Amino acid sequence: MIYLLDTDVVAELTTRARPDPRVTARFRSTAGLNRFLSVITVAEIEAGVAATPDPVRQARYARALAAVRHEYHDRIASIGGPEAAAYLAIHKTLKAAGAGIDPPDALIAATALADGWTAATRNIKHMARTGVLVINPWEEKL
């Protein structure tokens, strides 16, 4: 199974002093080559680093971001034609149902859908509505 890690998962694994053991166990049991990030996730992390007012924390987060960029340098999925088409389908479906989703979440879900991947997120409520296969590493058992 190939996982597209949502921003909350990356933050848990890289910035917490003691990441949740369920999350670390889930991804220790998964080959690194089967874990991807969306360019949207990277952008959300960059925005979070830039918005951190405490310079010490900002520096720590910037180091974590640099490590993530290094580790995933060849596994950062961009948004192309198939992802854009999946995004449009998600947007139309949810709009017709009277439900909304933040564009970053919809783009991450669209990337997973277009590539046949599983989205790993704590944000099950919003992601599941998109039709993407979703796991919550905080709840899933190995």
Per-region residue spans from a language model:
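General small-molecule cofactor/ligand-binding pocket signal
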Residues: 36, 77, 135
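A short helix-to-beta-strand connector/capping loop
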Residues: 31, 72-74
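Short, flexible helix/strand-to-coil boundary loops that buttress conserved ligand/catalytic motifs
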Residues: 14-17, 49, 91, 130-131, ...
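A conserved hydrophobic position in a structured secondary element of the catalytic/binding core
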Residues: 5, 37-40, 79, 122
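Acidic, PIN/NYN-like endoribonuclease modules and their adjacent C-terminal/linker elements
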Residues: 1-2, 109, 113-142
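Active-site neighborhoods of divalent-metal-dependent phosphate/nucleic-acid chemistry enzymes
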Residues: 47-58, 74-122
